[in-house]
Protein backbone atom coordinates (compact mmCIF):
# COMPACT_ATOMS: atom_id res chain seq x y z
CA UNK A 1 0.00 0.00 0.00
CA UNK A 2 3.01 2.28 0.24
CA UNK A 3 5.18 3.58 -2.54
CA UNK A 4 8.06 1.10 -3.01
CA UNK A 5 11.23 2.41 -1.39
CA UNK A 6 13.20 2.43 -4.64
CA UNK A 7 10.95 5.02 -6.26
CA UNK A 8 9.71 6.83 -3.16
CA UNK A 9 12.26 9.61 -3.70
CA UNK A 10 10.95 10.57 -7.13
CA UNK A 11 8.43 13.41 -6.96
CA UNK A 12 7.39 12.59 -10.52
CA UNK A 13 6.19 9.20 -9.22
CA UNK A 14 4.90 10.23 -5.79
CA UNK A 15 2.66 12.98 -7.19
CA UNK A 16 0.48 10.83 -9.51
CA UNK A 17 0.51 7.93 -7.05
CA UNK A 18 -0.79 10.11 -4.22
CA UNK A 19 -3.30 11.84 -6.50
CA UNK A 20 -4.66 8.45 -7.53
CA UNK A 21 -4.92 7.32 -3.93
CA UNK A 22 -6.75 10.52 -2.97
CA UNK A 23 -9.10 10.12 -5.93
CA UNK A 24 -9.76 6.53 -4.83
CA UNK A 25 -10.77 7.71 -1.35
CA UNK A 26 -7.57 6.57 0.33
CA UNK A 27 -6.17 9.98 1.24
CA UNK A 28 -5.33 9.12 4.84
CA UNK A 29 -3.09 6.31 3.61
CA UNK A 30 -0.85 8.73 1.68
CA UNK A 31 -0.79 11.69 4.08
CA UNK A 32 2.52 10.63 5.61
CA UNK A 33 3.96 9.87 2.18
CA UNK A 34 3.15 13.40 1.03
CA UNK A 35 4.64 14.95 4.16
CA UNK A 36 7.85 13.00 3.59
CA UNK A 37 7.92 13.96 -0.09
CA UNK A 38 7.50 17.63 0.82
CA UNK A 39 10.36 17.32 3.27
CA UNK A 40 12.60 16.03 0.49
CA UNK A 41 11.38 18.16 -2.40
CA UNK A 42 9.36 21.29 -1.61
CA UNK A 43 7.05 21.56 -4.62
CA UNK A 44 3.79 23.55 -4.86
CA UNK A 45 1.96 20.66 -6.61
CA UNK A 46 2.78 18.37 -3.66
CA UNK A 47 1.63 21.05 -1.24
CA UNK A 48 -1.68 21.54 -3.07
CA UNK A 49 -2.17 17.79 -3.09
CA UNK A 50 -1.57 17.71 0.67
CA UNK A 51 -4.37 20.25 1.10
CA UNK A 52 -6.77 17.91 -0.72
CA UNK A 53 -6.41 15.38 2.08
CA UNK A 54 -9.17 15.71 4.64
CA UNK A 55 -8.09 13.80 7.71
CA UNK A 56 -10.59 12.96 10.42
CA UNK A 57 -8.31 14.92 12.75
CA UNK A 58 -8.08 18.26 10.92
CA UNK A 59 -6.26 19.87 13.86
CA UNK A 60 -3.48 17.27 13.63
CA UNK A 61 -3.13 17.89 9.90
CA UNK A 62 -2.88 21.63 10.54
CA UNK A 63 -0.20 21.10 13.21
CA UNK A 64 1.79 18.89 10.84
CA UNK A 65 1.62 21.51 8.09
CA UNK A 66 2.55 24.32 10.49
CA UNK A 67 5.91 22.58 10.99
CA UNK A 68 6.79 23.74 7.48
CA UNK A 69 6.54 27.41 8.49
CA UNK A 70 10.11 27.42 9.83
CA UNK A 71 11.87 26.98 6.50
CA UNK A 72 9.00 28.35 4.36
CA UNK A 73 7.68 31.31 6.38
CA UNK A 74 7.22 33.52 3.32
CA UNK A 75 5.75 30.89 1.00
CA UNK A 76 2.38 32.25 -0.16
CA UNK A 77 1.24 28.78 -1.26
CA UNK A 78 1.96 27.33 2.18
CA UNK A 79 0.21 30.21 3.93
CA UNK A 80 -2.85 29.74 1.73
CA UNK A 81 -2.88 26.00 2.45
CA UNK A 82 -2.51 26.70 6.18
CA UNK A 83 -5.50 29.05 6.00
CA UNK A 84 -7.54 26.31 4.32
CA UNK A 85 -6.49 23.72 6.90
CA UNK A 86 -7.15 26.15 9.77
CA UNK A 87 -10.69 26.69 8.49
CA UNK A 88 -11.22 22.95 8.31
CA UNK A 89 -10.00 22.61 11.89
CA UNK A 90 -12.29 25.43 13.03
CA UNK A 91 -9.49 27.90 13.82
CA UNK A 92 -10.91 31.07 12.27
CA UNK A 93 -8.34 33.42 13.82
CA UNK A 94 -5.44 31.37 12.49
CA UNK A 95 -7.10 31.19 9.08
CA UNK A 96 -7.44 34.99 9.01
CA UNK A 97 -3.79 35.49 9.94
CA UNK A 98 -2.53 32.99 7.38
CA UNK A 99 -4.70 34.25 4.51
CA UNK A 100 -3.78 37.86 5.26
CA UNK A 101 -0.06 37.08 5.06
CA UNK A 102 -0.64 35.00 1.92
CA UNK A 103 -2.40 37.90 0.21
CA UNK A 104 0.34 40.32 1.24
CA UNK A 105 2.90 38.08 -0.45
CA UNK A 106 0.91 37.04 -3.52
CA UNK A 107 -2.78 37.77 -4.15
CA UNK A 108 -4.56 34.70 -5.51
CA UNK A 109 -8.14 33.89 -6.37
CA UNK A 110 -8.17 31.10 -3.79
CA UNK A 111 -6.98 33.40 -0.99
CA UNK A 112 -9.58 36.03 -1.95
CA UNK A 113 -12.24 33.31 -1.74
CA UNK A 114 -11.16 32.46 1.81
CA UNK A 115 -11.36 36.14 2.78
CA UNK A 116 -14.80 36.34 1.15
CA UNK A 117 -15.97 33.23 2.99
CA UNK A 118 -14.76 34.58 6.34
CA UNK A 119 -16.45 37.94 5.74
CA UNK A 120 -19.66 36.27 4.55
CA UNK A 121 -19.66 34.09 7.66
CA UNK A 122 -19.46 37.25 9.77
CA UNK A 123 -22.40 38.76 7.89
CA UNK A 124 -20.41 41.44 6.05
CA UNK A 125 -21.88 40.69 2.64
CA UNK A 126 -20.65 43.85 0.89
CA UNK A 127 -17.03 43.27 1.87
CA UNK A 128 -17.39 39.55 1.05
CA UNK A 129 -18.67 40.48 -2.40
CA UNK A 130 -15.66 42.74 -2.91
CA UNK A 131 -13.27 39.95 -1.93
CA UNK A 132 -15.02 37.47 -4.24
CA UNK A 133 -14.95 40.00 -7.09
CA UNK A 134 -11.20 40.50 -6.66
CA UNK A 135 -10.72 36.74 -6.66
CA UNK A 136 -12.67 36.45 -9.91
CA UNK A 137 -10.49 39.15 -11.46
CA UNK A 138 -7.37 37.24 -10.46
CA UNK A 139 -8.81 33.97 -11.78
CA UNK A 140 -9.50 35.68 -15.10
CA UNK A 141 -5.87 36.76 -15.34
CA UNK A 142 -6.58 40.38 -14.52
CA UNK A 143 -4.85 42.45 -11.89
CA UNK A 144 -6.71 42.73 -8.63
CA UNK A 145 -7.40 46.10 -7.11
CA UNK A 146 -4.94 46.08 -4.22
CA UNK A 147 -6.92 48.79 -2.42
CA UNK A 148 -10.05 46.57 -2.47
CA UNK A 149 -8.07 43.61 -1.12
CA UNK A 150 -6.55 45.76 1.62
CA UNK A 151 -10.00 47.13 2.48
CA UNK A 152 -11.44 43.61 2.79
CA UNK A 153 -8.50 42.59 4.98
CA UNK A 154 -8.98 45.67 7.15
CA UNK A 155 -12.62 44.75 7.68
CA UNK A 156 -11.60 41.17 8.40
CA UNK A 157 -8.91 42.29 10.87
CA UNK A 158 -9.87 45.70 12.22
CA UNK A 159 -7.20 47.52 14.20
CA UNK A 160 -7.69 47.39 17.96
CA UNK A 161 -9.94 50.10 19.31
CA UNK A 162 -8.14 52.96 20.97
CA UNK A 163 -8.49 53.20 24.72
CA UNK A 164 -11.00 55.89 25.66
CA UNK A 165 -9.36 58.97 27.06
CA UNK A 166 -9.74 59.26 30.80
CA UNK A 167 -10.82 62.66 32.01
CA UNK A 168 -8.25 64.69 33.87
CA UNK A 169 -9.33 64.71 37.54
CA UNK A 170 -8.05 68.28 38.06
Could you say what each language-model-derived stretch is?
Residues 3-7, 41, 57, 69-72, ...:
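Alpha-helical junction/boundary sensor with strong preference for TPR arrays
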Residues 12, 45, 77, 110-111, ...:
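Start-of-helix register in tetratricopeptide repeats
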Residues 31-44, 103-107, 119-144:
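TPR/TPR-like (Sel1-like) alpha-helical repeat modules
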Residues 32-104:
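Alpha-helical adaptor scaffolds
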Residues 53-68, 123-134, 141-145, 154-170:
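Alpha-helical linker/edge segments of TPR/alpha-solenoid repeat scaffolds
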Amino acid sequence: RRVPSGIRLETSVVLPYCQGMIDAGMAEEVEEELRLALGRDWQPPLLRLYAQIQLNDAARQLLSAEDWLGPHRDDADLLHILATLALRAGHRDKARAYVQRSLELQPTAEACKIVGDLLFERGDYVAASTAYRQGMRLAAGETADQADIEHALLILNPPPAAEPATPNPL
